[in-house]
């Protein structure tokens, strides 16, 4: 009874490109994992905006998932307001978005996790690619240069903002057959160079739901 009355620890869980807020519910066992740990899971929709603050009104998806959503859901539900009880995670586009959110709003999150995170560089862009074209990148990030520096700059901003205070814990995982393995290895090395302690794992598999299901279970067990 005492556990039931306590404010719930919370996982904010972000979907990937061309996904939606129901993906995690329908394609993984997140409901069971959350029930076993007695945590709340908040799954917002962000279209294909890469959880970046756009130029037009109503497109501030970065501020939404990093700050506004946290304040809103805490007013609506019986959630813990403790930073240590608040985690953000996601896959692919959502993985990169989760890491970015925790770095830009570190006061809100005790931990952040990305699975198969899409820390895009110009090597992923091609005029023939069905999604990642140079024009697409400019439309989302403003420029290709902004896209390439977005996530590393977020880490640097976190270091400056926290000024010696404890950073959010960071967890990264990617499949060894995933096309994003190279950019995840690069981001892992960057975190090492910056002295950011983090968990990094490479697992058998590709850009696929079985890996993401296993990954989110590990994330929940690690942080809750």
Regions found by a protein language model. Give the residues of each.
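Non-catalytic cap/lid and distal C-terminal segments of serine-dependent acyl enzymes
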Residues: 1-224
